Amino acid sequence: MKKVLVLLVAAMLAVTGAAATGCGGEKDILVVMREAGSGTREAFEKVVAKDGVTLEDISKDKTDKYSFVTKREEPKSTAGVITLVSSNKNAIGYVSLSSVGEDVKALTVEGVEPTTETVQDGDYKIQRPFLLLTRADGTITPAAQDFYNFCMSATALEHIDSEGLIEYPDRTPGTYVAAEFDTKQTINISGSTSMREVMTKLVGAYGKVQPNVEVKEAYPGSSGGRTAVKDDATGNTIGLASASSPSENYKENTLCLDAVAVVVNPANKLEDISILQLFDIYTGAVKKFSEIDG
């Protein structure tokens, strides 16, 4: 009888120990992705693919072969992604390279670090343009045109560089000459949250050389910027998009380039990741970081 009791106790302790190990074991990856309509999400999903299927195909319901992982977060801003990743050791997400600070760690992708050189020569694959959107029919108010001219000038390029963004090599910046206005003008810019920091800086610099134009800023996301330009028949709105999505409603004008950085918590030992591994993480085929060699 005593022997039976000893065996039962030993068995219970073994089960309890296994359960404790399980509770304290490695947790699943917390997948962080931007909300639908985000230019950052569009740029990321166009590139991340497997077997000819992109994450964008999943977003647009063009495939039933794969689906997104169930356990995920979809914050509506760059700051939201950074907050989640910086506070969770098991999180992974993606943000504008210019937004990466000490609170998150950017991974190399396929062994390539996101830099000015690797973006301009195309070696770093997850990249996108920062676009200024104007009406396709050419309608634009003089004040909106003046702000557009400033943004495309050599003066603006200095501020773009200071934000860690990348000069678009196929465009030669011009010289800005402020237009003259007899009365105070007001224009609107609307769109990508990823472009908020650089555009706020450009608006501030513009105000110092053009005191007669007030620029009202709104950042509802890239899709919101596209809609704002389409809906403003007067051409007094300049849209902001952080991914290309051609349309007959607007013209895309490249302000600069940006890398979409894949980020993890600084405590994560992972340093490199492949496109295929990213696809598997975002579709749930890979659930733990220990399944990745990087």
Name each model-derived stretch.
Residues 19, 24-294:
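Exported/periplasmic ABC-transporter solute-binding proteins
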Residues 1-24:
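Sec-dependent N-terminal signal peptides of Gram-positive bacterial secreted proteins and lipoproteins
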